Amino acid sequence: MDYPFILKKAWEGYDASKTIRDIEDISAMVSTNHVFKITFDDDDIVIAKLSHFGKYEYFKEDHRIIHSLCNNLLYPFENVLSKSLLKNNRVYIYRHRQGKDDAWVVFYNPTRIAERMPRRLDEHHIITLGQQIGKFHKACSRVKNVLPK
């Protein structure tokens, strides 16, 4: 599957006025998704997620829910999830079908990170991380009533 070709077609469908200069694979290699950093000629950057596992309808539904969650989380978690790019007030999702290939792309604004965690966590960091993840899950459960069904 030609990922750069698919990403370029996806971007053309979103905003053909901007030209892609570079596509860098930044995937964590821990899932079936492929994640790319896209840099444009004007140095703007977006993140693209490409998937070809599962069903398009589920991918689309998942990203509608993620977008709603992202926009409804309150402080201090309002910037934890990346914001999807919208077109016509909807999450823009590109579907590529060619032969046996069926892949989907969604674009995100990059999330800013003030400080990265150490590569190896000591016990204090592990406890703090666990507490923050617990608080994040509680914040997510508080917005469940406003998420799409």
Language-model-derived ranges and their functions:
Residues 1-25:
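Juxta-kinase regulatory segment immediately upstream of eukaryotic protein kinase catalytic domains
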Residues 18-41:
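ATP-binding glycine-rich phosphate-binding loop
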Residues 46-47:
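Glycine-rich ATP phosphate-binding loop
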Residues 51-100, 124-127:
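A conserved alpha-helical element in kinase catalytic cores
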Residues 74-81, 116-118, 142-146:
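Short secondary-structure capping/junction motifs at helix and strand boundaries
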Residues 99-114:
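Conserved short submotifs of the Hanks-type protein kinase catalytic core
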Residues 119-149:
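A cross-family kinase active-site recognition segment
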